[in-house]
Amino acid sequence: MLRRSLVTACVVVPGVLSAQQPTVSDSIHPHGDTLTHAIELQEITVTAAPTRREDPQAVITVTPTVISRTPATDAWDLVRQTAGVEVHLQGQGPGFAPTVSVRGFSSDHSTDMALWVDGVPINEPVNGHAEGYNDWNVLMPGAIEQMEVIKGPSNAKYGNFALAGAVNVRTIDRMHGIQGSVEAGSYGRVDANFLGGFDQAHWGGALALRYQRDGGWRPNSEYEVGQGNLRYVRDLSPSVTLDAGVGVHLTDWASPGYITADQFAAGQYDTVANTTDGGFKRRGQERVSLRVLANPNLLWRTTAYATQGRWQLYLTIPPEGGAGEGSGGQTEEEDTRYGLGLTSALTWALSRGQVTAGVEGRYDHSDYEKYFTTDRARDSVDTDLAAQQVSGGAFAQADLDPIPHLRVSIGGRYDALGTSTTPVGGLEVSDSKGIFSPKLGALVHLKHLVSLYANVSRGFRQTDGVIRDPSLPFITEWAYEAGTKLDGKKWNASVALFRADVSNEQSFDPITAVSTSGGQSRRQGVDLDLRIQPSPALGLTTAWTFTDAKYQQLITEDGDTLSGARIFNTARYVGTAAIDITPPKTTVFLRLATNVVGPYTPFDLPGVELPAYALVHLTGGIRFGSLLLQAGVRNLFDQKYPELRAGDFVSPGQPISGFGTVRYVW
């Protein structure tokens, strides 16, 4: 069924148009956004992902070299291994968006993190499952050219849902050659990829295709994924560039459901809540971008996009309150949506810096239905409504060097959102609101190797439940950051102290979908990042975040006071570390990496703290001419860990698994 859907989508979707995504620091250059790929298997070397050094904020750039050397299974896995960001899977299929945790923000389905791909926002407003639903699964690792991870809300180019920060992804737009790869692994995993393209100086393109099938390590957890990403770029003149493309994501999955904490402790992972649980997702996006260099100092860029999607989920929800309490039962959720958007920005190059000013607008429509079901047969209606949102924003960002060794960034944005919802057979309810978010930062170079920086900014996001009650207020934060960046010839490091004061804090149980909002919280801590490359044959990287995250004032629907308690699902520390080894003058490489999650309080269990755990992954490879062979083991020591825990229920993490990959380049 999925294979037929993928073929149909590729045939009926016309030659659709795609956009270029502005980077955090947009420089004016006639071909500054046209990144050319030549697929060559040269002598393997190690290159660490650098931290952006010139910005008064914490930004990590994941480069093409790093991407090509990282054995990531999916886009979220790529971020987890390269950017010091912790990711937790929901464990119920690839249509379930994972939870990204950054600086103590770990909301359900990554709704505190803004994700942009080629100028298109991925977060979904007016989503009945989770407001700002952010599905990393729609990204193809093999199609990614570059990725920037921006911690905190300090950049004016990102508005709604950027409480924890933003991730800006640019896909490959043109390249030379063709490559194909096939991966086989434990539990019946097969992952086939194709990447090819052309580059004729003033025009080019790239096509990426992926088919993935996995039998699942738990009963009733098999899935299929089909993806495609096509881009076409043409220089209409020396100063005008057109970028066109389309992306398609199709997936079907079965869900094993959650198990109790006692079953998890006993290793009883084979329990299946309901063999009819599962779902599907279909998503497409089209975009067109025009880039005009009006003069050597003025760049204009505009992007128009459209998105379409349908998502259906059958999932047995455990009884509220814990095992054995209440009846629980299966529910069906269905979300059918479409959206349109436009962004436009001007960048002026000055003698001492640059200024960017722009506007953006989008329209999103969602038909959301939720039913109580028995083995997929509908018993009664919980929710049936149509919702729409019109939003607009204006932003300006100036990055100036008023004197030598000093960078000042000042900016701000204003966002206005109008949301309306109409239950079937009911009356329309609507509300409009706006918010201004100032941004200010500075960086000073004390010496060639040392920089100090600080910033203060405001961020916001919409609250879960807006699709039913548009009058709900924004979740807002004031964020503060101060740090240092250190640079050497073969190493770089950064240390950042951060604090975020959040108003209208929300606690959301991802299993029961019960939310509590209206309180306050504070997140504060330190980020540490170190990357050492003593030789082309050896690379060492590590990134850690230590967080003290507590509710300052919050009362749940049950009347429990959470003031002073740790914020749910927020670890005291998270960290990553990796060693990359390549013997000199060989085509062999070895990578040993670990992800560490410190103690944390699960959802709806204040005062309870789960123990820390660490996952270790080992990967190696060798090249023979145009052939690259790669093999590895994930969760090398078979660590037992929970991907998600809420109350008495657990989604267990995957045990040890192996894989092997064959890649060939033409």
Label the model's feature ranges:
Residues 38-76, 95-99, 229:
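N-terminal periplasmic "start-of-domain" segments of outer-membrane beta-barrel proteins
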Residues 120-151, 169-170, 230, 471:
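Short acidic/polar hinge/loop motifs at secondary-structure boundaries
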